[in-house]
């Protein structure tokens, strides 16, 4: 069966393969991958699919939900042209070198090439044991799979660079998991997500070969990556790939990584586990594990229970961690570039690009035509302080800020506390925290904000135009942690309608969508400390 898909499996063609054909956990040397087939499951059941992703890879959406496609995306069958494999890579986890990691439960089916000659790798997450599974079982549960499926698509529609998700399928089998590693394992429903990306190559793919001083395989991987994903850096297709080209690739990775993290900060996304094996060479958000969304603005928040003490991967620290990870990648490339200076330039590009993109992003969130450091550094700093004085929902605050009438230079509106609070009260979690001191700080900031907006040379003449500009970058709908948990709870009981409804709402996160307002509500009190809503683990 072909589904009218054409496969061109460049990775398995270009990289050396593991010479051991048997599938058992082991150290794999001098190989970019191991060939391994998905483990068949007993009773696959279609839960949800993305029509946009199907069209992206050239798959007729009519196949979504069909028995034939369900069998393939559950790992029970292979379409013609597929060449399944698991990647070998390493990584730094929480700042420490972890050695070989690899695709422990992800199996790549192959690379689809579309009519416009774009390549898309299809990958099943939770498809069974591989040589890289270590002590795990290679499986995934419904809980984590619903979260990955929904967030992959939500992030894309938010405008955040990300891998995509084609499908979510139940396996019909139970999987034993200890959700919080507290000695109380339970059986959960098994599931598989089909992830889609131009490439799933990570920083850790390069690190593993550098750590083993396997320069030959490292060079092969770099050449494959540049010819496949960075061919625009070559003067001609078969041009030699030397240190200059490798340094140019690294510089581009630094730039796209900066852009990705700025988008995370814009929408309040916290990845939760920014290890180098979870960093895409293409600057895509990858591996949706214990991620979370800032609800009340807390720059020190991390959703990952494993990181609860050190908070290495907290929201505000993500830009610095991305830079740390890029340095780790640079160290892996030094054996090929021969010197550090060209790679140090890439790190400088990251710092510069992040700062520039951050300023542009904050200007957009506030409806300004451009960022002026002389005035806006203080305006933004005081805003971020204000958001912490009272527990304030970040998403709702920016959205409702756009609704406050400021007037024009000729006729500025006189800001009144009651009117401002009427707009912003929806964003406050605890009414008692809206003290007189807070109200004074709020009004001081609002007047500074109004003055800055009305002095903006590029400012639209009408409040409605400012509102339109702000609402284009400040989403109304994000995948709030409690919404994902409600979808999981329903799906666990056999009702997948909320997954489909959420997917539909999250396709238009910047639109008002009358009738869907319940999906824009701030976190309810019952979800404040509930597992899955406030904190998550790496158990999946």
Curated annotation (Swiss-Prot):
Entry keyword annotation includes Metal-binding? yes
The family classification in the record reads: Belongs to the SELO family.
Name the positions where ATP binds.
102, 104-105, 125, 137-138, 195, 202, 287
Q: Which UniProt keywords apply?
A: ATP-binding, Magnesium, Manganese, Metal-binding, Nucleotide-binding, Nucleotidyltransferase, Transferase
Named from the GO MF annotations, one term is: ATP binding
Enzyme active site: 277 (proton acceptor)
What is its cofactor?
Mg(2+); Mn(2+)
Reactions listed under catalytic activity: L-seryl-[protein] + ATP = 3-O-(5'-adenylyl)-L-seryl-[protein] + diphosphate; L-threonyl-[protein] + ATP = 3-O-(5'-adenylyl)-L-threonyl-[protein] + diphosphate; L-tyrosyl-[protein] + ATP = O-(5'-adenylyl)-L-tyrosyl-[protein] + diphosphate; L-histidyl-[protein] + UTP = N(tele)-(5'-uridylyl)-L-histidyl-[protein] + diphosphate
Q: What species does this protein belong to?
A: Rhodopirellula baltica (strain DSM 10527 / NCIMB 13988 / SH1)
Q: Which residues bind Mg(2+)?
A: 278, 287
Q: List the disulfide bonds.
A: none
Q: What is its EC number?
A: 2.7.7.-, 2.7.7.108
Q: What is the protein name stated in its UniProt record?
A: Protein nucleotidyltransferase YdiU
